[in-house]
Swiss-Prot record:
Database matches in Gene3D superfamilies: Argininosuccinate synthetase, chain A, domain 2, HUPs, Single helix bin
Keyword Ligase: yes
Domain of life: Bacteria
PANTHER family: ARGININOSUCCINATE SYNTHASE (PTHR11587:SF2)
Any one GO MF annotation of this record: argininosuccinate synthase activity
Localization per record: Cytoplasm
The protein's name: Argininosuccinate synthase
Keyword Metal-binding among record annotations: no
Subunit comment: Homotetramer.
Residues binding L-aspartate, per UniProt: T121, N125, D126
Entry binding sites for L-citrulline: Y89, S94, N125, R129, S178, S187, E263, Y275
Organism: Photobacterium profundum (strain SS9)
Pathway: Amino-acid biosynthesis; L-arginine biosynthesis; L-arginine from L-ornithine and carbamoyl phosphate: step 2/3
Length: 404
């Protein structure tokens, strides 16, 4: 391996990546450039982050505003597939990683770096997601993963490491929970959640109201969907990020989008987390409602198949692969007629579709009515059923012959 001279670090401003900066300089004798991705984690998380990076030893700090791109080019395409990992998880952390890695690589190439670095632990999925993206986008770059190299194995050790070098740090030993936030969701892991028999408490939820304490009066939101994408909410045209932000606020107020799950990590272990995805939950319900009107049976079944495969590809860090690209393209084609208007009721943790319509709807009241009608000849069903069940009939006849 050739000597590393300049490395671009995916920097969050947290304890881990603050310690990584001096560690890289000491162990690789290289220049460290901090790269910060603004994916909607909030202004508080970004306040003073450039100064913090420089104080930790970075030569410079670049902050990339990726909020709109993340929603438009990563979240919306994923939504079209219907991807929900293991039937529950709307892939909040998973979808943020490819865009962060892509922008980090672009930064590395722009500043002439020969290496990239991340602060992911050796137990999690994110190391695979980041390094899979690096390999697909810039295989010539050296990848440094400090958590697989250093001997700093505890929060206390990291704090001592920074204190010994007089590097300021606002972190403390008292931190119990691990959190990850972006425009799509907030995840909370660790603490009481590490025992699956423990109930979550108020510290496990930071974004949404407890449904029990949510407003007693329901609220509705009207969502306009065009080609599988939310383009307006409550009569106002909005950009993807603004639409998500608006629905996040509405959903969080009513306790929408909470899940407490145990999931199968890619690396082979199970983990428990409390995930909050208020706006995403509302968007997903709206899109699926329009699909119910527009997609024929075979197309809907295929979209479900696409969604299942997409959920594993995205979760497993396979965004930048030919298969994932093909899956996303298929979902986008299916979504060309997925346009309509949906009204969603928000109440006590639930997002319930109560009205839906589409100019492309295949639903016909004339054909669907249980009352008397003149458009459907019931006698036609007999021939269809006979042909539809022909294979079963032949199989049964063969079985009867064998038994004689």
């Amino acid at each position: 391996m050739s000597k590393v001279t300049k490395v671009v670090l995916a920097y969050s401003g947290g304890l881990d990546t603050s310690a990584i900066i001096p560690w890289l300089k000491e162990n690789y004798d290289c220049e460290v450039v901090a790269f910060v991705a603004d994916v909607g984690q909030g202004a508080a998380e970004l306040e003073g982050i450039e100064e913090k990076a420089i104080a930790s030893g970075a030569s410079s700090c670049y902050i990339a505003d990726l909020k709109e791109e993340m929603v438009a080019d990563y979240i919306y395409p994923s939504l079209k597939t219907g991807a929900i990992y293991e039937g529950k998880y709307l892939l909040g952390t998973s979808m943020a990683r490819p865009i962060i890695a892509k922008a980090q690589v672009e930064c590395a190439l722009a500043v002439g770096a020969d290496a990239v670095c991340h602060g992911c632990t050796g137990k999690g999925n994110d190391q695979v997601r980041f390094e899979g993206a690096y390999a697909a986008l810039a295989p010539q770059l050296t990848v440094i993963a400090p958590w697989r190299e250093w001997d700093l194995r505890s929060r206390e050790a990291l704090l001592d490491y920074l204190a010994e070098r007089d590097i300021p740090c606002t972190a403390s030993l008292e931190k119990i929970y691990s959190r990850d936030a972006n425009a799509w969701h907030i995840s909370t892991e660790g603490g009481v959640l590490e025992n699956t028999w423990n109930q979550s408490n108020e510290l496990c939820w930071v974004w949404t109201k407890d449904p029990e304490n949510a407003p007693e009066k329901a609220e509705t939101v009207s969502i306009l969907v065009e080609k599988g994408e939310v383009v307006a909410v409550d009569g106002e045209a909005m950009s993807p990020f603004n639409a998500l932000t608006y629905l996040n606020e509405k959903g969080a107020e009513h306790g929408v989008g909470r899940i407490d799950i145990v999931e199968n990590r890619l690396v082979g272990i199970k983990s428990r987390g409390c995930y909050e995805t208020p706006g995403g939950t509302i968007m997903n319900e709206a899109l699926r409602a329009v699909e119910q009107l527009v997609l024929d049976k075979e197309s809907y079944e295929f979209r479900e198949t696409v969604g299942l495969k997409a959920s594993h590809l995205i979760y497993d860090g396979r965004w930048f692969t030919p298969l994932c690209k093909s899956i996303l393209a298929a979902a986008d084609e299916l979504a060309q007629d997925v346009s309509g208007e949906v009204v969603v009721k928000l109440y006590k943790g639930q997002a319930t579709v109560i009205q839906k319509r589409s100019m492309n709807s295949l639903y016909s009241e004339e054909f669907a009515t249980f009352g008397e009608d003149d458009v459907y000849d019931h006698s036609h069903a007999g021939g269809f059923i006979r042909l539809y069940s022909l294979a079963s009939r032949i199989r049964a006849l063969n079985t009867q012959k064998k038994q004689k």
